[in-house]
UniProtKB/Swiss-Prot annotation:
<keyword id="KW-0067">ATP-binding</keyword>
<keyword id="KW-0066">ATP synthesis</keyword>
<keyword id="KW-0472">Membrane</keyword>
<dbReference type="Pfam" id="PF22919">
    <property type="entry name" value="ATP-synt_VA_C"/>
</dbReference>
<dbReference type="InterPro" id="IPR027417">
    <property type="entry name" value="P-loop_NTPase"/>
</dbReference>
<keyword id="KW-0375">Hydrogen ion transport</keyword>
<keyword id="KW-0547">Nucleotide-binding</keyword>
<dbReference type="GO" id="GO:0046933">
    <property type="term" value="F:proton-transporting ATP synthase activity, rotational mechanism"/>
</dbReference>
<keyword id="KW-0139">CF(1)</keyword>
<dbReference type="InterPro" id="IPR000194">
    <property type="entry name" value="ATPase_F1/V1/A1_a/bsu_nucl-bd"/>
</dbReference>
<dbReference type="InterPro" id="IPR004100">
    <property type="entry name" value="ATPase_F1/V1/A1_a/bsu_N"/>
</dbReference>
<dbReference type="InterPro" id="IPR036121">
    <property type="entry name" value="ATPase_F1/V1/A1_a/bsu_N_sf"/>
</dbReference>
<dbReference type="InterPro" id="IPR055190">
    <property type="entry name" value="ATP-synt_VA_C"/>
</dbReference>
<comment type="function">
    <text>Produces ATP from ADP in the presence of a proton gradient across the membrane. The catalytic sites are hosted primarily by the beta subunits.</text>
</comment>
<comment type="similarity">
    <text>Belongs to the ATPase alpha/beta chains family.</text>
</comment>
<keyword id="KW-0406">Ion transport</keyword>
<dbReference type="GO" id="GO:0045259">
    <property type="term" value="C:proton-transporting ATP synthase complex"/>
</dbReference>
């Protein structure tokens, strides 16, 4: 175990000089004891570069307040490691695997795995394609999720990415009883706190491990916390043979943290000021999220889109790895349609007749073509009004509006705000409901009856409450 001395401190980046034959390897964890007002604190550093002359450049996982030149640094001889296995369920951790909830500390005998590792080899990968039912109509019908796939939730600020993730955690735990790992990467501490207490109240927390590196933490923690969460998920997949869900909120903050330290590490910035290693860092994370012959890790990642610009290098780097995208659209939130998922922009490679079946595929495509036709007619309606449309076009518009409203539904996790009970709709009921709308079976029911309901039975009940004969 080598000993070194701090030679330079630049915010979250610290240079350390070691003896000639004791220079630590890249990704090794180093430990510094720092004197602060509250006493002596252990600060963990991760080796990022070897600069030559026995100096390494490191990234701090916590605040560097109190670190001085000449402070002694110890090489741990290994990379950062986090606890894995059943002991992590129901607990909240930081990037280093230390518990940050109010319960007692984990036993030191709990197994720990290093956060840096290779992706599974080709011969270990599974090629089986299976749909993951979410109970959310717009997703299950138009952009279904694949077990062991990677799904991106794209949207600007405040369009509902985190609420959608919370609903997915709730639905999958309640309906499928699956294990989830939640990695909070650079998001609001309040949201993490709310999520923890909501999950505790619903009992879902017993099946979930949570890892947080929030907005107020240094970029080193935000950059590595996704790997900490992934390592916990990999153990459930590889050792216990489980199908695990890994939620990352928000993957953009992972990139943002990398760009914050990149310049301090001495790298030349690339497009829009991002780090030149953007594609490599993203690939190293995403390639580990996969299905193997032992089990699967299905990843659902919220992706913040800066200024709603999908060509920005950060969201573009994520796109390349995804099996399905769920695009959230601000215009839909303005119309009061929740979840505000854009039915035309959201995609999935699972929307294929050989995977979902011919009926589901045809109804999904008919729904999309009806909505597309409605979108094309909106300019004419805005200028000339509905009266100028042909009878066929009027019928298309009326059905499209019913479809648009029927794609919305109440969420379980939003019950406390809306006062409405949440809905879980099985795929079969979703497909039957949209088929009935396309066939004109419900043309006599006012479109308001389709807003924020679950199955078609709820539409009929709502219409009766409105005094309509069904």
């Amino acid at each position: 175990m080598g000993l070194g001395r701090v030679t330079q401190v630049m915010g979250p980046v610290i240079d350390v000089r070691f003896e000639h034959n004791e220079v630590p390897e890249i990704n090794n964890a180093l430990v510094v004891d720092v004197e602060r007002d509250e006493g002596t604190v252990s600060l963990t550093l991760e080796v990022a570069l070897q600069l030559g002359d026995d100096v390494v450049r490191t990234i701090a996982m916590d605040s560097t307040d109190g670190v001085k030149r000449g402070t002694e640094v110890r090489d741990s001889g290994d990379s950062i490691s986090v606890p894995v296995g059943d002991a992590t369920l129901g607990r909240v951790f930081n990037v280093l695997g230390d518990t940050i909830d109010l319960d007692e500390k984990l036993d030191t005998s709990v197994k720990r795995d290093p956060i840096h590792r290779e992706a599974p080899a080709f011969d270990q990968l599974s090629t089986k394609v299976e749909i993951l039912e979410t109970g959310i109509k717009v997703i299950d019908l138009l952009a279904p999720y694949i077990k062991g796939g990677k799904i991106g939730l794209f949207g600007g600020a405040g369009v509902g990415k985190t609420v959608l993730i919370q609903e997915l955690i709730n639905n999958i735990a309640q309906e499928h009883g699956g294990i989830s790992v939640f990695a909070g990467v650079g998001e609001r501490t309040r949201e993490g706190n709310d999520l923890y207490y909501e999950m505790s109240d619903s009992g879902v927390i017993k099946k979930t491990a949570m890892v947080f590196g929030q907005m107020n933490e240094p970029p080193g923690a935000r950059m590595r916390v996704a790997l900490s969460g992934l390592t916990m998920a990999e153990h459930f997949r590889d050792v216990q043979g489980q199908d695990v869900l890994l939620f990352i909120d928000n993957i953009f903050r992972f990139t943002q943290a990398g760009s914050e330290v990149s310049a301090l590490l001495g790298r030349m910035p690339s497009a829009v000021g991002y780090q030149p290693t953007l594609a490599t860092e993203m690939g190293q994370l995403q390639e580990r999220i996969t299905s193997t012959t032992k089990g699967s890790v299905t990843s659902i990642q919220a992706v913040f889109v800066p200024a709603d610009d999908y060509t920005d290098p950060a969201p573009a780097a994520v796109f390349a790895h995804l099996d399905a995208t769920t695009n959230l659209e601000r215009k839909l939130t303005e119309m009061g349609i929740y979840p505000a998922v854009d039915p035309l922009a959201s995609t999935s490679r699972a929307l294929d007749p050989t995977i979902v079946g011919q009926d589901h595929y045809e109804i999904a495509r008919d729904v999309q073509s009806t909505l597309q036709k409605y979108r094309e007619l909106q300019d004419i309606i805005a200028i000339l009004g509905m009266d100028e449309l042909s009878e066929e076009d009027k019928q298309t518009v009326e059905r499209a509006r019913r479809i648009q409203f029927f794609l919305s539904q109440n969420f379980h996790v939003a019950e406390q705000f809306t006062g409405q009970k949440g809905s879980y709709v099985p795929v079969q009921k979703t497909v039957e409901g949209f088929k009935a709308i396309l066939d004109g079976e419900y043309d006599h029911i006012p479109e308001d009856a389709f807003r924020l309901v679950g199955s078609m039975e709820e539409v009929i009940a709502k219409a009766k409450d409105m005094g309509v004969e069904v």
